[in-house]
């Protein structure tokens, strides 16, 4: 199996039928949110485009992005790693180690200059000349710059590479730095999350291989196809938010009924991600469905934004559960206040008019 083979050629060699291949393309189009009309375009790309070499680097991180990636169901990670791409370097997954691993990295960079994708998990620390993270006897930041020099594009996996994450939380003693602040001359796509959703990760790769370009990005560099909506927008608990039905404390009656978690710190209203639509573990669940509020892990600096259990802000709404007496009482108080204010303004105007009249009619003294 070589990088010059196409995905379809690899699939055929593995005994996959044409029908199964087209089914795969259809599922991929659906997973990317493109619809069935793009099935033929994806099939054509898989049949004609050679497998792209990918180098996957690891800096300061916990490897949760890799753990998420290997659990992708649409497409299956085995299809991505063994057929769609040529994963030439990943020190977590590859069999080679030491000098052999470093030789594989150098060989791919030399043979495919300008034609490989660099995926980065984790970030480089810059304090002490980068000595807080050593790969192959050298600072990781040096390996990053070396691999990025001839890369076609860079994918920043997870919040570590995209924003800095916990390593960059105050006071950030190692000066952990997001990839885009170190590499400034390459197209970079950010896929934040701690970790990102598996199907989001494989979906980004599939899109880039199919269309030969980065997906449309938002102003922060994230793919709009997965980060254009707040979790709150599609959350199944949203009707409870609109109704004013909230969990006041964990394990109260509202929690048992599945009410909105906003008051116990859910960051869904300010977090852009696909958790409430794609979900996790092959679409099984996501944190809010499990009873815990969103912590906003795909947003920049979420570690430094206060407690995960502090509400974002107070809200003032009746909610459809408010009864007529409550609403009527509130309206009556408001009306009474308005009448009092009107009376006060009228009294001031009368007093001002009286003073002006008195000044006008007073006779002048003779000198």
Swiss-Prot record:
Gene3D superfamilies: Cytochrome-c3 hydrogenase, C-terminal domain, NADH:ubiquinone oxidoreductase-like, 20kDa subunit. [4Fe-4S] cluster 1 binds at residues 62, 65, 160, 194. This is Uptake hydrogenase small subunit. This enzyme recycles the H(2) produced by nitrogenase to increase the production of ATP and to protect nitrogenase against inhibition or damage by O(2) under carbon- or phosphate-limited conditions. It comes from the Bacteria. Binds 2 [4Fe-4S] clusters. Predicted to be exported by the Tat system. The position of the signal peptide cleavage has been experimentally proven. It is found in: Cell membrane. GO terms for cellular component: [Ni-Fe] hydrogenase complex; ferredoxin hydrogenase complex; plasma membrane. Heterodimer of a large and a small subunit. Its cofactor is [4Fe-4S] cluster; [3Fe-4S] cluster. It catalyses: H2 + A = AH2. Residues 1-45 form the signal peptide. [3Fe-4S] cluster binds at residues 275, 294, 297. Belongs to the [NiFe]/[NiFeSe] hydrogenase small subunit family. GO terms for molecular function: 3 iron, 4 sulfur cluster binding; 4 iron, 4 sulfur cluster binding; electron transfer activity; ferredoxin hydrogenase activity; hydrogenase (acceptor) activity; metal ion binding. The lineage of its organism: Bacteria, Pseudomonadati, Pseudomonadota, Alphaproteobacteria, Hyphomicrobiales.
């Amino acid at each position: 199996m070589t990088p010059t083979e196409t995905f379809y050629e690899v699939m055929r060699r593995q005994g996959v039928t044409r029908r199964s291949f087209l089914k795969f393309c259809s599922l991929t189009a659906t997973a990317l949110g493109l619809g069935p009309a793009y099935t033929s375009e994806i099939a054509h790309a898989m049949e004609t485009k050679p497998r792209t070499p990918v180098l996957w680097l690891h800096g300061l991180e916990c490897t949760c992005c890799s753990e998420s990636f290997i659990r992708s169901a649409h497409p299956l990670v085995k299809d991505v790693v063994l057929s769609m791409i040529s994963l030439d370097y990943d020190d977590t997954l590859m069999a080679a180690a030491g000098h052999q691993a470093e030789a594989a990295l150098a060989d791919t960079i030399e043979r495919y200059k300008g034609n490989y994708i660099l995926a980065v998990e984790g970030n480089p620390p810059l304090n002490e000349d980068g000595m807080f993270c050593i790969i192959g006897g050298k600072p990781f930041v040096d390996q990053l710059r070396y691999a990025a020099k001839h890369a076609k594009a860079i994918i920043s996996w997870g919040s570590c590479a995209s924003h800095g994450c916990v390593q960059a939380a105050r006071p950030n003693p190692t000066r952990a730095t997001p990839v885009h602040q170190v590499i400034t001359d390459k197209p970079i796509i950010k896929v934040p999350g701690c970790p990102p959703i598996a199907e989001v990760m494989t979906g980004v790769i599939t899109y880039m291989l199919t269309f030969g370009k980065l997906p449309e990005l938002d102003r922060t560099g994230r793919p709009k196809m997965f980060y254009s909506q707040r979790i709150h927008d599609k959350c199944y608990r949203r009707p409870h938010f609109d109704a004013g039905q909230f969990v006041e404390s964990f394990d109260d009656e509202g929690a048992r009924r599945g009410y909105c978690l906003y008051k116990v710190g859910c960051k869904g209203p300010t977090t852009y991600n696909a958790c409430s639509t794609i979900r996790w573990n092959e679409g099984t669940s996501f944190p809010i469905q499990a009873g815990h509020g969103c912590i906003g892990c795909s947003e920049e600096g979420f570690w430094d934004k206060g407690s995960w259990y502090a509400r974002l802000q107070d809200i003032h709404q009746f909610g459809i559960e408010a009864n007529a007496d409550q609403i009527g009482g509130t309206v009556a108080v408001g009306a009474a206040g308005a009448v009092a204010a009107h009376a006060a303004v009228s009294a001031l105007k009368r007093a001002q008019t009286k003073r002006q009249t008195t000044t006008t009619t007073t006779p002048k003294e003779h000198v």
